[in-house]
């Protein structure tokens, strides 16, 4: 089993904790300024850093797996190399770096993550020019393709332990935190606005998206579930 659990580096972690809960994530334990974890369909970790830290405002693509050794075996069989790093209170961490320089990490938690629940799913987006190698890596990890754009610019994947990952063709390599919401997006926007956040639902070419201002003065995207499949193909990982 594998769970999508990106790591967000935040210079204002308490503000991010509040936003995470307002969007619909639930703290796994009382948040603190250094490290906090939240759960929904998938997970999110918030790592507090100094304002001048180059990592501030960035996101790492991280996964939780139930068998790290078996995961490494699958990666090696698919042609990837995993580097081991021992971490205090965590154990071994696997790091995979692909040809574009994009870096993915994996750890094995001491107890299984909660089962996916609720309408909010974690959906980190992986941007890079060529999507073939990221797709091969995600499939080696056991994620299943859900939707792909016929134009080849987008593909997303579902993890059996919770969460989604989107691949988006772009000239730059980066990861971005986002979410998918399968319930009433307008009602979520109203709740966020009532809580004091600048939030609005906009009509994109592919779907409706909620944009909410973050503590980093950027926008967090919460996508509505995509039901209009014109120009898209549904794959085996999509729910019936």
List the model feature ranges, each with a label.
Residues 1-18, 59-61, 107-136, 140-144, ...:
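N-terminal beta-strand motif that seeds the catalytic metal site of vicinal oxygen chelate
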Residues 2-12, 38, 50-120, 125, 148-150, 156-166, ...:
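Vicinal oxygen chelate
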Residues 15-22, 75, 101, 134-139, ...:
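Conserved active-site tyrosine of GNAT-family acetyltransferases
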Residues 21-28, 79-81, 139-146, 197:
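Conserved acetyl-CoA-binding loop of GNAT-fold acetyltransferases
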Residues 24-59, 102-110, 143-179, 212-229:
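Conserved short beta-strand elements that form part of the metal-binding/catalytic scaffold
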Residues 34, 68, 130-131, 153:
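A generic "binding-loop/recognition-motif" signal
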């Amino acid at each position: 089993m594998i769970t999508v659990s990106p790591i967000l580096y935040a210079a204002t972690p308490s503000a991010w904790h509040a936003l995470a809960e307002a969007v619909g994530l639930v703290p796994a334990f009382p948040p603190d300024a250094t490290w906090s974890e939240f759960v929904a369909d998938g997970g999110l970790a918030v790592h507090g850093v100094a304002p001048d830290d180059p990592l501030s405002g960035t996101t790492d693509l991280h996964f939780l797996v139930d068998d790290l050794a078996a995961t490494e075996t699958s990666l090696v069989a698919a042609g990837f190399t995993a580097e081991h790093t021992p971490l205090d209170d965590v154990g071994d961490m696997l790091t995979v770096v692909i040809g574009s320089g994009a870096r993915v990490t994996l750890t094995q938690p001491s107890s299984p993550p909660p089962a996916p629940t609720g309408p909010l799913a974690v959906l980190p987006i992986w941007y890079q020019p060529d999507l073939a190698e990221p797709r091969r890596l995600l499939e080696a990890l056991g994620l299943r393709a859900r939707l792909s754009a016929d134009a080849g610019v987008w593909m997303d994947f579902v993890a059996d332990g919770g969460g989604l990952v989107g691949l988006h063709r772009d000239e730059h390599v980066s990861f971005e935190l986002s979410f998918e919401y399968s319930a009433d997006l307008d009602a979520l926007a109203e709740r966020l606005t009532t809580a004091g956040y600048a939030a609005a639902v906009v009509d994109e070419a592919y779907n409706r998206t909620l944009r909410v201002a973050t503590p980093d003065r950027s926008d967090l995207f919460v996508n509505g579930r995509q039901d209009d499949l014109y120009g898209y193909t549904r794959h085996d990982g999509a729910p019936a």
